[in-house]
UniProtKB/Swiss-Prot annotation:
<keyword id="KW-0206">Cytoskeleton</keyword>
<keyword id="KW-0175">Coiled coil</keyword>
<dbReference type="InterPro" id="IPR049258">
    <property type="entry name" value="ODAD1_CC"/>
</dbReference>
<dbReference type="Pfam" id="PF21773">
    <property type="entry name" value="ODAD1_CC"/>
</dbReference>
<feature type="compositionally biased region" description="Low complexity">
    <location>
        <begin position="621"/>
        <end position="639"/>
    </location>
</feature>
<comment type="function">
    <text>Component of the outer dynein arm-docking complex that mediates outer dynein arms (ODA) binding onto the doublet microtubule. Involved in mediating assembly of both ODAs and their axonemal docking complex onto ciliary microtubules.</text>
</comment>
<dbReference type="InterPro" id="IPR051876">
    <property type="entry name" value="ODA-DC/CCD"/>
</dbReference>
<dbReference type="GO" id="GO:0003341">
    <property type="term" value="P:cilium movement"/>
</dbReference>
<feature type="coiled-coil region">
    <location>
        <begin position="303"/>
        <end position="380"/>
    </location>
</feature>
<keyword id="KW-0966">Cell projection</keyword>
<dbReference type="GO" id="GO:0036158">
    <property type="term" value="P:outer dynein arm assembly"/>
</dbReference>
<feature type="region of interest" description="Disordered">
    <location>
        <begin position="574"/>
        <end position="658"/>
    </location>
</feature>
<comment type="subunit">
    <text>Component of the outer dynein arm-docking complex along with ODAD2, ODAD3, ODAD4 and CLXN. Interacts with ODAD3. Interacts with ODAD4; this interaction may facilitate the recruitment and/or attachment of outer dynein arm docking complex proteins including ODAD1, ODAD3, and ODAD4 to ciliary axonemes. Interacts with DNAH9. Interacts with MNS1. Interacts with PIERCE1 and PIERCE2; the interactions link the outer dynein arms docking complex (ODA-DC) to the internal microtubule inner proteins (MIP) in cilium axoneme.</text>
</comment>
<feature type="compositionally biased region" description="Low complexity">
    <location>
        <begin position="592"/>
        <end position="604"/>
    </location>
</feature>
<keyword id="KW-0969">Cilium</keyword>
<feature type="coiled-coil region">
    <location>
        <begin position="11"/>
        <end position="156"/>
    </location>
</feature>
<feature type="coiled-coil region">
    <location>
        <begin position="186"/>
        <end position="234"/>
    </location>
</feature>
Length: 658
């Protein structure tokens, strides 16, 4: 029992000790942490930071009082402003109650209407400015389209030239490869020729040596043959020799003559003595040895001389061959030089021929250019004589002191429309005294009567659909110089044929003022113009309001005119009104609308787009500008017709404001 208690007590003590040790360890850790914080807080940097923070806190506390005072002042101002606002609200309320008088209401309505008119005028000016900019944008789009087409042509030409350059480079590469292979084959052939020549030279030298050896052997054999022949001849008995031999034998027998051996010995002794005197050597063996050496040396020299002679002969042959080769080379060079000179002469002739052709083409170009300039000048003169409207052309092309080549079609189309108008007016003036006004209007519009009172020749405007030659001109882009020149030349030929036909038929010519105006037919695209333009006796009514506005165009005097006629569109009812005055040959009528006029010059799409986007707005500013331009271009020979209303009173109908 005691043991159990002791164990329990010891266990409890141990647990308590462990807890105390754990608490001591935690306290020590906390102490170390606090000590670290104390050390950090007691550092110089912390003290400086604390001082800085204390100073900032003092400044903020001082500024807090000032800000509080300012806030109170602003609150006082807000309260004062609120009070003033309440006072003004009460004042406005009282004034609104007192503003029920009729005069004040009328005055305010007048001010509002004046403001509306000012805004409408501003809107009209902005609309006109916008229309002008649309026309300019259309011209710029056309010019951009032309530039795009030119760019496409340039790219096609550049692609073709690049393809040709690529083909030429491939051809040059093939030629260089073939020339390199030919040069390699030539070098190989030249090397083989050198080797064959060396072999031939060696074989020739060897054959020469063998020939010399054979010749030497042949000469030796010939000498041997002669020697043997001589020996054979000596062996044959000769009578004189026999006689001499007998005589010598007799002398020998008598003792009067020595034998041949003795004579030979004596002769040898004499010869040795002479040789000893000549050479200074008395020993016969030495003499024989020297003689053999001398013979060997002579034979060696003979061989050397023969070899030198053969080599000289070989060199002479080589020199002769080289001279022949040089002569042949000089001849080939002379022949090649002659061929090159002939080629140079032929090339020079070709160059001279091309230069002459280029000069002829340049002269022809200058002549054609002069003809084109003359045609442009005549077109300008015809444009001025016809008193065509130049305001639209100035708006489209800008103010220019010269006429470009691509502008000829525009000028001709304007002249054509002007001539159609003049022809219509002339036809109407011719028939106005011979038929009633309704019949005259029908005849002017190209309609035939059931029972015509007088047979008249119908005046047909130029056919703008197709040319007699079958050429069709597209208005997608302007004509080039060559196309324009061909069309003008064809039109001139047609004009000459028409003039000759007129001279043969003796028909009267159309005159405008005093000079004669020849009508040049220029093909246009898409539509044929009717006998009378759509502007004759037409009524230009507003789409939105239902009221019509009147535009007047004045022409000069005509030689064939019988009396004045004024045609204009009436009011909203649409009945035509004709007036006659005492002035001769002066007629005014409503011109073609701006949309149709722009459509005939290639800007129909732009004008239609502008009308469609306006949502029922029909702008007549361009028509008024056309009427002003036509009336001003008539000069001193015509006077403008009186307007139907004052120009200052710009209404909503004329502006097309809906």
């Amino acid at each position: 029992m005691m043991e159990l208690e002791r164990r329990a007590y010891s266990k409890e003590v141990h647990q308590r000790l462990r807890k105390q040790v754990e608490e001591i360890r935690q306290l020590e850790m906390l102490r170390a942490k606090l000590q670290t914080q104390i050390n950090v807080a007691q550092s110089q940097v912390k003290r400086l930071g604390d001082k800085k923070h204390l100073a900032e806190m003092e400044c903020l506390l001082k500024s807090r009082a000032q800000v509080q005072v300012e806030i109170e002042a602003l609150q006082e101002q807000n309260r004062a402003l609120d009070k003033q606002i309440q006072d003004w609200e009460t004042h406005v309320l009282t004034q609104s109650k007192e503003a029920s008088a009729p005069d004040l209401i009328m005055y305010q309505k007048m001010k509002i209407q004046r403001r509306i008119r000012i805004l409408e005028d501003q809107l009209d000016r902005v609309t006109c400015h916008f229309d002008i900019h649309l026309v300019r944008n259309a011209a710029l789009r056309e010019e951009l389209e032309l530039l795009r087409i030119e760019r496409g042509r340039y790219l096609n030409m550049d692609r073709k030239l690049k393809k040709e350059i690529h083909l030429l480079r491939e051809m040059v590469g093939a030629l260089s490869t073939s020339s390199t292979s030919a040069y390699t084959a030539r070098e190989e052939a030249k090397t083989k020729m050198g080797m064959l020549q060396e072999r031939a030279e060696k074989e020739l030298a060897q054959s020469d040596t063998e020939a010399q050896i054979l010749l030497r052997q042949i000469s030796h054999l010939e000498q041997l043959h002669r020697f043997l022949k001589l020996k054979n001849d000596e062996r044959q008995p000769d009578p004189r020799v026999v006689q001499k031999a007998e005589q010598r034998d007799w002398e020998v027998s008598e003792g009067l003559r020595k034998t041949s051996q003795e004579k030979l010995v004596l002769r040898y002794e004499d010869t040795l003595g002479k040789l000893a005197q000549l050479t200074g050597e008395s020993d016969p063996d030495l003499l024989v040895e020297k003689y053999l050496e001398l013979e060997e040396r002579n034979f060696a020299e003979f061989n050397f001389i023969n070899e030198q002679n053969s080599e000289i002969h070989h060199l002479q042959e080589e020199i002769k061959e080289m001279q022949e080769a040089l002569v042949s080379e000089h001849a080939s060079q002379d022949k090649q030089r002659m061929q090159q000179e002939q080629q140079c002469k032929m090339l020079q002739q070709d160059v001279d021929k091309m230069c002459s052709e280029s000069e002829q083409l340049e002269g022809r170009f200058q002549v054609l250019r002069g003809q084109l300039e003359k045609i442009k000048t005549d077109i300008q003169v015809l444009f001025d004589k016809a008193k065509c409207d130049s305001s639209v052309i100035k708006d489209l092309l800008g103010v220019k002191t010269y006429m470009r080549d691509r502008d000829i079609g525009l000028f001709l189309s304007t002249i054509e429309r002007r001539l159609v108008q003049l022809l219509t007016v002339q036809a109407f003036l011719q028939v106005q005294n011979l038929a009633p006004l309704a019949d005259a209007a029908l005849l002017a519009l190209g309609q035939s009567l059931q029972e015509p009172s007088k047979k008249t020749t119908p005046l047909k405007p130029p056919d703008t659909m197709e040319d007699s030659s079958g050429a069709v001109i597209k208005e997608d882009y302007p004509m080039s110089k060559e196309e324009l020149l061909s069309q003008v030349m064809k039109s001139l030929q047609l004009q000459d044929e028409e003039e000759s036909a007129k001279k043969l038929d003796s028909s009267p010519s159309l005159t405008l003022s005093s000079p004669q105006i020849s009508l040049v037919t220029v093909p246009k695209h898409s539509k044929k113009t009717s006998v009378v333009p759509e502007s004759i006796l037409s009524h230009k009514t507003n789409r939105g309001r239902g009221t019509g506005s009147v535009s007047h165009v004045t022409f000069g005097d005509s030689a064939s005119a019988a009396g004045p006629v004024a045609m204009a569109s009436a009011s909203a009812s649409g009945a035509p009104v004709s007036s006659r005055s005492s002035q001769g040959g002066r007629g005014g009528f409503k011109p073609t609308s701006s949309s149709s006029y722009l459509g005939s010059t290639g800007y129909l799409e732009t004008s239609r787009g502008r009308e469609s986007t306006a949502g029922g707005v029909h702008s007549q500013s361009m028509g008024s500008e056309l009427s002003r331009g036509l009336s001003s271009s008539s000069g001193h020979a015509s006077s403008p017709a009186p307007p139907s209303r004052p120009s200052s009173s710009t209404s909503k109908d004329s502006r097309g404001y809906n």
